Amino acid sequence: MSQQTPLAYAVAQWLQQSSTSVPADQKAKLQQAAKSVSEAFGVDTSSAEQQAQYGSGPGLQAIFDIFLKTQAKMGAAPAPAAASSSSTAPAAAAATPSDEDLAKAEQLKAEGNKAMSAKDYGAAIEAYGKAIELNPNSPVYFSNRAAAFSQIGQHDSAIDDAKQASKIDPKFGKAYSRLGHALFSSGRYQEAVEAYQKGVEVDPSNEVLKKGLAASKEQLSSSSSSNANDATASRGAADAVSAPSAGADAGAGAGGFPNFGGGAGGMPDLAAMMNNPMIAQMAQNLMSNPDSLASLMNNPMLRQAAERFGSGGGMPDMSSMMNDPALRDMARNFMGGAGRGAGGNGGNNMYG
């Protein structure tokens, strides 16, 4: 095995993975590039044997991210010979963007905003990234890219960008909104509370931050007692399954969805659901928007509910799930509603 083989495999794998989050006209180019690398070095990313041999590591993107973070930390460290008066100067001060770069960065930001409105999140991430390259001192660019990362479920990247935005400008309230949203969506409720709390301190009149803080506190309280309630909930679900049905309303109350006839054990009547125009529209939007579908499936609360239901734990508590601002945001979006939930990436919390 050549020493280049693992690297070639990682490059081909990264190209294929990247093709899922770019515009259609760029997808074919990335796939062709992956094919060329695979053929040139004799690697096959679809091979289970090569996957086990070369693909068990963290991946090329993760390794590169670690390199960038390490480089940033080393670059931010004060030089031993530096004068004390310069030790407090920002690291970026030596590379102040030119007026031309600033204007181009603003143009790229506008392109990213337009892509966000069109739900083309891959293009938005690319545009904001180019703007950051030209002007890394703008908290808005990092904040906007954090919103785009959240939309496709890349919450770790969103957290990094939101933290960088707050580091550049500690009084930029929207950075804490992005950070709280990404932390909440990752199931890190205590950290989400802290992020939203900091945001409320710097921007007391921001209703999005207040709602996000309230939702995070409620979810933190709920999640802290969920383990104690799991056994009781399972017994209650078993009783509901064995109890005789008292009609459609009883089915809905026994763990089913509201406003739909309940089937056995509180399961919703799927035929009735698909006859509902809002549910039909939501299903259609899900099928036509793979990025949002990926974000939905990455939501920790929804994933936990699905796992609990699959193991016989009964239907999830829909009212509790709708307290998750990320789920509420996506539900309104899929059903054609205007505005977003607390802590989300829309409504009064639009990108800059």
Curated annotation (Swiss-Prot):
Keywords attached to this entry: Repeat, TPR repeat
Positions with biased composition (Low complexity): 80-97
Pfam families named in the record: SGTA_dimer, TPR_1, TPR_11
Annotated TPR repeat ranges: 105-138, 140-172, 173-206
Gene3D superfamilies for the chain: 1.10.260.100, Tetratricopeptide repeat domain
Location of region: Disordered: 80-103, 217-236
Domain of life: Eukaryota
GO BP, sorted A to Z: post-translational protein targeting to endoplasmic reticulum membrane
Secretion signal span: none
Gene Ontology cellular-component annotations: membrane; TRC complex
GO terms of molecular function: molecular adaptor activity
Annotated function: Co-chaperone that binds to the molecular chaperone Hsp70 and regulates Hsp70 ATPase activity.
Family named by the database record: Belongs to the SGT family.
Protein name: Small glutamine-rich tetratricopeptide repeat-containing protein 2
Originating species: Mycosarcoma maydis
